[in-house]
């Protein structure tokens, strides 16, 4: 039996089941924890001055990690409250945030939180590319897709996203290993999101080319 916490392929849901988060709120839930992370790292010393109890957590990057974990839990809780499901991608990312964030705070070593994007993106890339290797286009189970594509379209889109996730993992490794913590945090918030948006927009011609019309759906 499928556990209700995991979101099924939208094509298998009835209209009554498709309780969706409004687009602006969905964007806020995705960006909110990252903005909290950026603000806490950039203004950590100010926060510690105003709230001395926070000094026990440590340097700004550790305070940012703790608040990032809290904001991630809140975002997932809001999503669950509104839809009674959790999309696979935010759920897995949230679990990794909590695990690596806890290691960061426990061991007082920011390497763990810096490696979190590498782990998450490598995992998603490996799942998508591994699925293709076994003849499965798994993209529909990773994204809350509202569109329908033919088999070739799903294969191409899955390949592109799989390679893109691997690219993001490599970029994260290069940035955190060669630049300052502040530079890495800024790139994580203000670099990755624009890159992802541009990449997503570049996929629109492929999506339009391989979209199934109503006639295609009826025939299938």
From Swiss-Prot:
The chain crosses the membrane at residues 20-40, 57-77, 86-106, 123-143, 156-176, 187-207. GO terms for cellular component: plasma membrane. It is found in: Cell inner membrane. Coiled coil: none annotated. The keyword Transmembrane applies. It is a multi-pass membrane protein. Keywords: Cell inner membrane, Cell membrane, Membrane, Transmembrane, Transmembrane helix. The keyword tRNA-binding does not apply. It holds the Pfam family IspA. Plays a role in cell envelope biogenesis, maintenance of cell envelope integrity and membrane homeostasis. Belongs to the YciB family. PANTHER family: INNER MEMBRANE-SPANNING PROTEIN YCIB (PTHR36917:SF1), INTRACELLULAR SEPTATION PROTEIN A-RELATED (PTHR36917). This is Inner membrane-spanning protein YciB. The lineage of its organism: Bacteria, Pseudomonadati, Pseudomonadota, Alphaproteobacteria, Hyphomicrobiales.
